[in-house]
Amino acid sequence: MHHAKKDDIEKIMNIFKANRKWFPHVREYHIKTRIERNQVILEDDVVITYHYYTRNQPLSKKDKEGNDIGKKVMAEKGDCILHQIVKDKESKSKASDVLQKFFKTVKSNKVYLSVRSENEVAIKFYLRNGMKLVGRTTWSEGKMPGNIYLYENHLYVKPPEEIKVKKVKVKKTKKVATLEAHLEF
């Protein structure tokens, strides 16, 4: 996978502008920041923005009355959140191929994303690519409903946590010169 570079910003922003209906909130400074953090992939005219959670993070939210809108979904530290995937409309490349490659290279067992409930094209795309609906969310103070999807990456093996070894003082003993002296009690 090719992480985007600063020189790619114009191309990336043009792809987002062509898809303004679904990404009206994406700003250039936001993409520049993500590029600096190696959180933007540009491959075959497909853009993916993502990051790894540094702490446990609730993904499901409440409706405008403050009620839970379904099962609570909690991402754990180290899980991946895919923020956006968008393709150049003029390109013949397949976003599905790029997404599958992303799934194979991401360093996480779980990849989450949320999408507006009305975005049927995206929802069908996510389902075709092995994601499962796991919860609901909202934006704009509960006015814009969304779905939470999860891809479980069984190819990634999480490294074991660092093992902390406690230092112990070793008691020095007298050296024994002969076998007979060693065997005496």
Q: Language model features by range: what are they?
A:
Residues 91-105, 124, 128:
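Conserved acetyl-CoA-binding loop-helix of GNAT-fold acetyltransferases
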Residues 113-123, 139-144:
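Conserved beta-strand-loop-alpha-helix junction that forms the acyl-donor binding cleft
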Residues 1-7, 160-163, 185:
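Conserved N-terminal entry element of GNAT/NAT acetyltransferase domains
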Residues 49-84, 90, 140-145:
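Conserved acyl-donor/pantetheine-binding loop and adjacent beta-alpha core of acyl/acetyltransferases
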Residues 20-40, 49-51:
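Active-site rim helix/loop that mediates acceptor-substrate recognition in acyltransferases
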Residues 16, 126, 131:
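Conserved active-site tyrosine of GNAT-family acetyltransferases
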